[in-house]
């Protein structure tokens, strides 16, 4: 998947993505797994890629996202990724097996590099 992104694949993420990414970095720093300077380099390098943040999904938080989170017993964060892929007809990439199963049940195609 990383190679596809490097090669210029379109990447679309829900609005929560930036906060999830920052949280991951902050937790890793707190646990001394990564230095703040490394986080800064990572974020700078990430800017080189075209990543579209879909703000429209926020409009569906109280309906589709909530329904999918309940139905598939996922977090609202996970359900926001499902909602985005379903609404925009995008393939779905994850290593989370239960999330992948939920995507399959929704008829969302898996990402094929």
Stretches with model-predicted labels:
Residues 25, 29, 50-51, 69, ...:
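Short amphipathic alpha-helical interaction patches enriched in hydrophobic/aromatic residues
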Residues 13, 76, 93-94:
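Short beta-strand scaffold positions
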Residues 17, 60, 81, 98-99:
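Alpha-helix capping/helix-boundary segments
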Residues 82-113:
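Acidic, PIN/NYN-like endoribonuclease modules and their adjacent C-terminal/linker elements
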Residues 1-17, 28, 32-41:
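Short, well-structured N-terminal submotif of metal-dependent ribonuclease cores
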Residues 15-18, 38-71:
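Acidic catalytic patch
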């Amino acid at each position: 998947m990383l190679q596809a992104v490097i090669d210029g694949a379109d990447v679309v993420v829900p609005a929560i993505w930036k906060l999830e990414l920052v949280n991951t970095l902050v937790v890793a720093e707190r646990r001394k797994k990564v230095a703040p300077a490394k986080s800064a380099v990572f974020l700078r390098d990430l800017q080189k890629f075209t990543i579209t943040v879909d703000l429209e999904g926020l409009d569906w938080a109280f309906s589709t996202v909530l329904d999918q989170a309940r139905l598939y017993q996922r977090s609202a964060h996970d359900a926001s990724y499902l909602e985005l892929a379903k609404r925009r007809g995008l393939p779905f990439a994850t290593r989370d097996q239960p999330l992948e199963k939920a995507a399959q049940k929704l008829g969302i195609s898996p990402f094929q590099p």
